[in-house]
Swiss-Prot record:
<comment type="function">
    <text>Protein L1 is also a translational repressor protein, it controls the translation of the L11 operon by binding to its mRNA.</text>
</comment>
<dbReference type="GO" id="GO:0022625">
    <property type="term" value="C:cytosolic large ribosomal subunit"/>
</dbReference>
<dbReference type="GO" id="GO:0003735">
    <property type="term" value="F:structural constituent of ribosome"/>
</dbReference>
<dbReference type="GO" id="GO:0000049">
    <property type="term" value="F:tRNA binding"/>
</dbReference>
<dbReference type="InterPro" id="IPR005878">
    <property type="entry name" value="Ribosom_uL1_bac-type"/>
</dbReference>
<dbReference type="GO" id="GO:0006412">
    <property type="term" value="P:translation"/>
</dbReference>
<keyword id="KW-0678">Repressor</keyword>
<dbReference type="Pfam" id="PF00687">
    <property type="entry name" value="Ribosomal_L1"/>
</dbReference>
<dbReference type="InterPro" id="IPR023674">
    <property type="entry name" value="Ribosomal_uL1-like"/>
</dbReference>
<protein>
    <recommendedName>
        <fullName>Large ribosomal subunit protein uL1</fullName>
    </recommendedName>
</protein>
<keyword id="KW-0689">Ribosomal protein</keyword>
<keyword id="KW-0820">tRNA-binding</keyword>
<keyword id="KW-0699">rRNA-binding</keyword>
<keyword id="KW-0687">Ribonucleoprotein</keyword>
<dbReference type="InterPro" id="IPR016095">
    <property type="entry name" value="Ribosomal_uL1_3-a/b-sand"/>
</dbReference>
<dbReference type="InterPro" id="IPR028364">
    <property type="entry name" value="Ribosomal_uL1/biogenesis"/>
</dbReference>
<dbReference type="InterPro" id="IPR023673">
    <property type="entry name" value="Ribosomal_uL1_CS"/>
</dbReference>
Length: 231
C-alpha cells in the first residue's frame, strides 16, 4: 500500500489543485499520469447548475463518442420478427423475446447493454427489479427503447455512453482510455459536453456548466477552466 500511496503522492504533485486548466492541458496532464499497469479509463465529472430533486431538471440521455470508448460491449436485444433479424445483422450478441426474458430471470446476464423494441416492453417491464439495479433497463430517453433496434445496436457498438445526473447534480462518464491520443480524448470530451449543453433543462437557471474535472482510474484529477471548453 505504501508504494501505491507514494506513487499517488508523486502524481498529485504534478497538478495544482487550485488551478483551472485549459481543456487540452488538463487532458494531457491526466493522460501522462495514467501510469498503472492496465489501460486506465479517462473520465469526466461535470457539475451542472440543476436541482436534481426536481424531475424537470434531471439531465439524462446518451451520445455516441466520435472516437469510441475503447471498450467492446455485448448487446442484448428484446425484439421479434423483422426487428430481431435486423438486430442480429447489426451485430447484437443476444436476441430474443420471451425466451430472453427467461434467461434474464435465470440470472444469465452476459451483456453490457439492453435494447428493446416498443412492443417488447410488456415483457421487459417485468424484469425491472433485475435490470434496473444493474443499470440495464431500456429507456427511450437514452435511445434503448426504439423501433429502430438496428441503429441502436450500431450506436452501442460505436461507443455510445449514457449519462444521468446523480443526487448532487453531477454527470460522470468515460471519454476513452489512457492509450487514446490526446486529440481523440478532446473530441470525445467536446461531444459529451455539447450533448449536455443541448440537454439543458428549461428550468435550469444561472450558470449551467459549473465545474468540470478530468481524471483517470488510478491517477490524478485536473479541474477544467469552463471558459476553454469551446476554445
Amino acid at each position: 500500500m505504501a508504494k501505491i500511496s507514494k506513487r499517488l503522492q508523486n502524481l498529485k504533485a504534478t497538478v495544482d489543485r487550485n488551478k483551472l486548466y485549459a481543456v487540452d492541458e488538463a487532458i494531457a496532464l491526466v493522460k501522462a499520469a495514467a501510469t498503472a499497469k492496465f489501460d486506465e479509463s479517462i473520465d469526466i465529472a461535470v457539475n451542472l447548475g440543476v436541482d436534481p430533486r426536481k424531475s424537470d431538471q434531471v439531465v439524462r440521455g446518451s451520445v455516441v463518442l466520435p472516437r469510441g470508448t475503447g471498450k467492446s460491449v455485448r448487446v442484448a436485444v428484446f425484439a421479434q420478427g423483422a426487428n430481431a433479424e435486423a438486430a442480429k445483422a447489426a451485430g447484437a450478441e443476444v436476441v430474443g423475446f420471451d425466451d430472453l426474458a427467461e434467461q434474464v430471470k435465470a440470472g444469465n446476464l452476459d451483456f453490457d447493454v439492453v435494447i428493446a423494441s416498443p412492443d417488447a416492453m410488456r415483457v421487459v417491464g417485468q424484469l425491472g427489479q433485475i435490470l434496473g439495479p444493474r443499470g440495464l433497463m431500456p429507456n427511450p430517453k437514452v435511445g434503448t427503447v426504439t423501433p429502430n433496434v438496428a441503429e441502436a445496436v450500431k450506436n452501442a457498438k460505436a461507443g455510445q455512453v449514457q449519462y444521468r445526473t446523480d443526487k448532487a447534480g453531477i454527470i460522470h462518464a468515460t471519454i476513452g482510455r489512457a492509450s487514446f491520443e490526446a486529440e481523440a480524448l478532446r473530441e470525445n470530451f467536446s461531444a459529451l459536453v455539447d450533448a449536455l449543453v443541448k440537454a439543458k433543462p428549461a428550468a435550469s437557471k444561472g450558470v449551467y456548466l459549473k465545474k468540470i474535472a478530468v481524471s483517470s482510474t488510478m491517477g490524478i484529477g485536473a479541474r477544467v477552466d469552463t471558459a476553454t471548453v469551446n476554445a
